[in-house]
């Protein structure tokens, strides 16, 4: 609703976004002297310039600002994709006058954060350090293994990061 639908979005946006995501990962690898890396969800902040440079906003979007609109689009995409791979957190929330039927698979993760724990993962952190930090969150690895039991350590870690971003997008934890 903040993007001018009449202006259209060219295929160049997708290409530029892909290149910027890969570039963010390569930059991080070079800074940390790593031979290999992967694109993490946190690298997707690198695509924001691709979005702001390729979309036209309506008046309300201009008022909010191109950066914020791009960030919100990214957040909405994570929210939409999250429920394709993991249970929808919105369906687990208690409705007025109704009992919660399904066990909340995110309970131990939320409880870990509610207990005063936090996770500070900076954009330029080494892959091995990021993986180590992700494993500190109670229940996070178990949740990923429950739904994707055949991943490698790096694939699991990427999914663990995805879960955290997804839960934040669904307001179960704070960023």
Predicted regions and their residues:
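An accessory alpha-helical subdomain
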Residues: 4-13
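C-terminal helical "lid" of AAA+/P-loop NTPase domains
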Residues: 12-30
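C-terminal engagement/docking regions of AAA+ P-loop ATPases
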Residues: 6, 26-175
